[in-house]
Amino acid sequence: IYDIQSRYMEQHPHHIPLIFMADVIHGCRTIYPIPLGQACSFHPELVSEAASIAALEASSEGLRATFSPMIDVSRDPRWGRIMESFGEDPYVNGIMGKAMVDGYQQKADTKIAACLKHFAGYGAVNAGRDYNDVEISQRTFLEQYVKPFRMALKAKPAMVMTAFNAIDRKPISGNKELLKGLLRDMEGFEGTVISDWGSIGQLEEQGVAADMEEAAIQASEAGVDIDMMSPAYMMYLEKLVESGKIPEALVDESAFRVLMMKNQLGLFENPFAGLGKSGKLTQHNREKAYQMAGESCVLLKNEKKILPLSVKKKVIWAGPYTASREFLSRWSIFGEHESVETIEEVLQKKQIEAECITGCNILSDAECKVWQVEQELSDKPRDEQWLETITREDTVVCVPVSYT
């Protein structure tokens, strides 16, 4: 990043620095529970502290903006992105979203630009199908799905990201009424609006733009400042200004907002601020992740008072994750599995008497089919010794595969 930034600024006539962005969703090098888990802590101060640590680690890598937090009210477990949200309650999403923005943008020398997403209604897609339309009443939309944004905007996030979906058959990335009328005029947002991945180009696929050129016009007029990963702005914006189809002042407004974001991050004074700074995956950071994990746990029942487990009693730990390092979950692109301690390693380190059995991983065993495992377990055990060991002990902790 240092080399790219240096070469770019040398070649740029006005020496305007680049801003590097990435998905830092629930930690950077130190990984915390997913946002849905963090919501279970009901501890916004800890959420803010975790975001501040993530900002420090991200800025040390040269990243100065994240596409987080996601505060879509999510009530359909079929929706694949529900793990990024703080759950089903608008108030919890608003409180936790604001706390996360505060954490990301808190410290002058290591802060990163926060991005509220996805504006708006993305969590209400029909049948939980990603990219689907949203059909809800205006009252429900404003009171339930816009409310978290209204709350989190008080923290003054640098960016807001548009949603993929359409409201009343109008895709958000080209929806002037929502982006200018509601977000900017009514809610007072003055920062940068960025599209989601390719969502401007998808205006053509959604049937509201005849071609990519018209998609660029609609998005620009709606107030989208940054076109993420579609060719619409890059290919057509300059031509549209020259032909008079888009006012030059409209492009100037968007450019000004992006420049202001860079200025607020201090990139003009020091485009390398935080780069190479130490503090990644420190013991302090690990302890905060451990604290968050503990506070995120939800005890559903403890009828026979099995918990807490006694360290004096032998316990069987059974399942594929007993010896696995894959505990970082999704959207943890900067986490390293090599840094994770397995359950088996931790038990040995703490000298706790336990036996770990991995068993069969039905999700990644290339030679295994679910119906075969079911048949073998009912007729002839796949591993008789494994089953015998489990049934011999009074206490078994199941550590199954988590699939998202």
Give short role names for the model-derived ranges.
Residues 1-403:
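Glycoside hydrolase catalytic-domain context in secreted enzymes
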